[in-house]
Amino acid sequence: MAAAAAMAEQEGARNGARNRGGVQRVEGKLRASVEKGDYYEAHQMYRTLFFRYMSQSKHAEARELMYSGALLFFSHGQQNSAADLSMLVLESLEKAEVDVADELLENLAKVFSLMDPNSPERVAFVSRALKWSSGGSGKLGHPRLHQLLALTLWKEQNYCESRYHFLHSSDGEGCANMLVEYSTARGFRSEVDMFVAQAVLQFLCLKNKNSALVVFTTYTQKHPSIEDGPPFVQPLLNFIWFLLLAVDGGKLAVFTVLCEQYQPSLRRDPMYNEYLDRIGQLFFGVPPKQTSSYGGLLGNLLSSLMGSSEQEEGEESQDDSSPIELD
């Protein structure tokens, strides 16, 4: 039995080597076509080979060929062909029911970073990639993919969309560093506290206490316009500091007094009290209001934050009116 198993393993290794060799030979021919400028013919050949490999259940070969082809087309400025092959990479992942792995997420983030930021293909790609990365366990997408997308968007200085993806990652430190840059580059000095306050409140609405604490600590330590604290000069920052302590304690009386005492600061943004209603329910046992199914603006904001549908998520990441946009 052991000998038979060893022989089978060796045969499998030989077949795998032959398959890789075959893919490499085909890839060489396709690369030569692209180098010559025969973009259309090369694109059609990539598609033909993709469906041939998929029909033979050679999902990994199909995926690797489409990924390398997409990178090749991107390097030659062929955005449409590259985006099409990128979507085929996703199709191979979906149909093969491949488990989520860091390398795959990094590959998806790589092609995302090369896509034209204003192209509709990018919107479709990120929505579909996040849906696949959720693995059927949720609607928000894998935190690592969100982090990689956030980093790319940050480099593009697309701070609003970057913040959305940071909120759904576990990278509180990265989020804070991005917010420091966003605040100093685009914000008013009088609003330095509001940038981090909204991020903390939204992390708490997503039940992510750890990232809420990290983003607050990192932001207040690194922002050049915030003096050392706590306590802080800005009352709103003191409120957030006390709130994070109260969340750990879970005492409703403390939460209630805190919200009452800091109402002048909380009135600076009408959404603060709405977020705090939700935080009260999540961490302090506050019963939902009679109109528990939030309507109007808040309903849209919270459903988007909590990922009520994949479609909404894809749209949210491209919409400047998203719930995570700071005033």
Curated annotation (Swiss-Prot):
Annotated region (Interacts with BAG6), positions in chain: 195-271
PTM section of the record: Ubiquitinated by RNF12, leading to proteasomal degradation. When unassembled from BAG6; ubiquitinylation is modulated by BAG6 quality control role and effectuated by RNF126.
A Pfam family reported for this protein in Swiss-Prot or TrEMBL: GET4
Keywords: Acetylation, Cytoplasm, Transport, Ubl conjugation
Region annotation (Disordered) ranges: 307-327
Family membership noted in the UniProt record: Belongs to the GET4 family.
Quaternary organization: Component of the BAG6/BAT3 complex, at least composed of BAG6, UBL4A and GET4/TRC35. Interacts with BAG6; the interaction is direct and localizes BAG6 to the cytosol. Interacts with GET3.
The protein's name in its UniProt record: Golgi to ER traffic protein 4 homolog
UniProt source species: Mus musculus
